[in-house]
Curated annotation (Swiss-Prot):
Function field: Key enzyme in the regulation of glycerol uptake and metabolism. Catalyzes the phosphorylation of glycerol to yield sn-glycerol 3-phosphate.
Binding site for glycerol: R82, E83, Y134, D244, Q245
Binding site for ADP: T12, R16, T266, G310, G411, N415
A molecular function GO annotation: ATP binding
Taxonomic source organism: Methylorubrum extorquens (strain CM4 / NCIMB 13688)
GO biological process, one term: glycerol metabolic process
Family: Belongs to the FGGY kinase family.
HAMAP family (UniProt xref): Glycerol_kin
Name of the molecule in the record: Glycerol kinase
One Gene Ontology cellular component: cytosol
Length: 501
């Protein structure tokens, strides 16, 4: 009887395969990085063939390290970097171009042209998304318009489009020899081509971006048996797909409305489950699909993205030389009792949710002769917590649903000082789970549910365990004063970049 589930975690910089047991404990993992390709300023690409080769390799390596055979796996789940766009030839399996990565901004001008007629929110009611080069639709349109023969191949069904999950599933299930061309609802919701109401491709959106329907994958549930793998693990069911941030929400077992998680990495991604109906945002958030279990209604989410959090620590290390390693920031920040009145607003390329101010730029404010390296380090950590509070308050305003606690994951959660201050400034507990790989765990859970390895969502809740919990310690007046100072600092960052400068 199979006693493990495997998860492919295909990220922006690397691909991993992680094997979990029935308790959600990691048995083994393998990882390989792939090349970041920068053909021009603002362009970011990946080689889909390299990603597939690495996926194939880490699957074999990870399973071997676990001491298991393919038959020991009940299912395989997939989680992936979202929005990254692949176009390939279904006859040969060869990409028509390198994948255009979610960070790529080559379509900024075409998106701005669309926004001139109706504004950046003109399609938000249908897709939940503002007009942005971030999402897949404009990237696919660029490929169809700039790759020789691509549009003709797309129109006759010879070319296939997909986000990274689609590319992996197609290759895992046979490639040119009958590979499945599918994507799940979470990834489809990030293309700007899917209707949140119907969970199908929207004909009007296809018309706006001039996308032939024949090029698109079939949209499936996030947890459902899609078929069986053929290579490298013949016969093992493919049971689930989730975009990376939705996978983290699922891995954190945020299955009820009002439950939220925040992933602390280079930036932060906060998601809140809003239940079975989409919640429109008037506070600068994105409305998206959280997940859909096979045969059940979908769960929706509000998402807020913060551009610079962990990257601010890297800036202190690499640009200012205040620390020699990122791990040193906690000790430096603890060398002082508070921020000394110093605030750092990390608007290096503007501010994301909930402000969305392209004209903002970074600042350090509140400096006196009293301020020292420790105060600046502490202010950098506190900036992450302040920005998270702004996003969570926007979520509560949009949804009308209070967030009782925040489940935290990602690399920065090892910083106890940050996690304590996060609880203090939110005035609610923050929790770090015992299993830190929540993104891969979410993909494993989705796949295991589909195959009966886990029976119910309650089985998954029973697996979730707290590694550490932080409760608020500061008084309400101190919290109010600290956040008021942050708000004043943020306002002063606005308008630095002049439109015609």
């Amino acid at each position: 009887m199979p006693d493990a589930v495997g998860a492919i975690d295909q990220g922006t910089t690397s691909t991993r395969f992680i094997v979990f047991d029935r308790r959600g404990t990691i048995l083994a993992q393998a990882q390989r990085e792939h090349e970041q390709i920068f053909p021009r300023p603002g362009w970011v690409e990946h080689d889909p063939r390299e990603i597939w080769r690495n996926t194939h390799a880490v699957m074999r390596e990870g399973l071997a390290r676990a001491g298991l055979a393919p038959g020991d796996l009940a299912a395989i789940g997939i989680t992936n970097q979202r929005e990254t766009t692949v176009l390939w030839d279904r006859r040969t399996g060869e990409p028509l171009h390198d994948a255009i990565v979610w960070q790529d901004t080559r379509t900024d001008r075409s998106v701005a042209a669309l926004a001139r007629d109706g504004g950046r929110d003109r399609f938000r009611a249908v897709t939940g998304l503002p007009l942005a080069s971030y999402f897949s639709a404009s990237k696919l349109a660029w490929l169809l318009d700039h790759v020789d023969g691509a549009r003709a191949k797309a129109e006759d069904g010879t070319a296939l489009f997909g986000t990274i999950d689609s590319w992996l599933v197609w290759n895992l299930t046979g490639g040119p020899d009958g590979g499945l061309h599918v994507t799940d609802v979470t990834n489809a919701s990030r293309t700007q081509l899917m209707s949140l109401a119907t969970l199908d491709w929207d004909e009007a959106m296809l018309g706006v971006f001039r996308i032939p329907r024949a090029v698109l994958p079939t949209i499936v549930s996030s947890s459902a048996v899609l078929g069986e793998a053929r290579d490298p693990f013949p016969g093992v069911p493919l049971g689930g797909i989730l975009g990376d941030q939705q996978a983290a929400l699922f891995g954190q077992t945020c299955f009820s409305a009002g439950e939220a998680k925040n992933t602390y990495g280079t930036g932060c991604f906060a998601l809140m489950n809003t239940g079975p109906a989409p919640v429109a945002s008037s506070a600068g958030l994105i409305t998206t699909v959280a997940y859909r279990l096979d045969g059940r209604p979908p769960a929706y989410a509000l998402e807020g993205s913060i551009a610079i959090t962990g990257a601010l620590v890297q800036w202190l290390r690499d640009n200012l030389g205040l620390i020699g390693a990122s791990s040193e920031i906690e000790g430096l920040a603890r060398s002082v009792e508070d921020n000394g009145g110093v605030y750092v607003v990390p608007a290096f390329s503007g501010l994301y949710a909930p402000h969305w101010r392209d004209d903002a730029r970074g600042l350090i404010i509140g400096l006196t002769r009293y301020a020292n390296r420790g105060h600046i380090a502490r202010a950098c950590l506190e900036a992450t917590a302040y920005q998270t509070r702004e996003v969570l308050e926007a979520m509560e305003r949009d949804s009308g649903c209070p967030i009782a606690e925040l489940r935290c994951d990602g690399g920065m959660t090892v910083n106890d000082l940050l996690m304590q201050f996060q609880a203090d400034i939110l005035d609610r507990p923050t929790l770090r789970p015992k299993v830190s790989e929540t993104t891969a765990l979410g993909a494993a859970y989705a796949a295991g549910l589909a195959t009966g390895f886990w029976k119910t969502l309650e089985d998954l809740r029973d697996n979730w365990a707290v590694d550490k919990r932080w409760h608020p310690h500061i008084q309400a007046e101190e919290r109010r004063a600290l956040f008021a100072g942050w708000s004043r600092a943020v306002e002063r960052s606005f308008g630095w970049v002049e439109e015609n400068a």
